[in-house]
Amino acid sequence: MKIENGVAKKYRKSVDDALDAIIAQGNDDHKRVTKLILDSKMLIQVKPVSEVKASGVTGVISPWRTRGKLDEPMGLKEALGEIYICIAEETIDTGGQRGCEGTLVHEGRHAYDFAQMIESLSEADINPLKVFDPTLYELELAAHKTAGEYMLCVNRGEYINEGLDLGILGKEATGQCFVSDDGIKLRLKTNYSVTHDGDQGRLASEIVGLR
């Protein structure tokens, strides 16, 4: 992983600390994805929210360059090197470490799924039936679920409260919290206008400009 030149020291430290925390506190999937990112040449950017337009966003650094590489099989780690995650400065300024961790867990899942998509497209001539190209609904469902699972792993007040406020987590009558499939699906319908049995949105390859 590499952090873009020019990113302020405090943001670099926040990103490094967040990735360390995810490995220390997350489940096996969180650890696996984060370690893959750290071992790759994936790019991390930090920019004002006026440019990012969200707490974080994930995409392909250069779609035309990546398209040119799809003629040859590409491994997952190499594919991650085609990806960037951009975090809004305000995510760290106002959300602190929790905000940075949560964004990296969510966007890290997108980065992993985009890399899987790129890897599968590069092998499409060999394995045309194994192309992985999820819809926006599938991408966001996976990212929201992994974010909810991380909140439960950390199991501290501010993390749990954020999950409950966002509808990602639910609470049993006993007080036990859980990842809420219904809450996440409602959030996807409200915020992204996608549903399981209706419009699932564009394919990952279309979202990042590879098709």
How does the language model describe each region?
Residues 136, 148-211:
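Long, well-structured alpha-helical subdomains associated
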Residues 98, 102, 114-141:
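Post-HEXXH active-site segment of zinc metalloproteases
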Residues 1-69:
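A metal-dependent hydrolase signature that marks the N-terminal structural subdomain at the beginning
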Residues 2-7, 19, 90-94, 98-99, ...:
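Second-shell loop/turn segments in exported
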Residues 57-101:
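Active-site scaffold of zinc-dependent metalloenzymes
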Residues 10, 14-17, 32, 99, ...:
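Extracytoplasmic/secreted proteins, especially bacterial periplasmic and envelope-associated proteins
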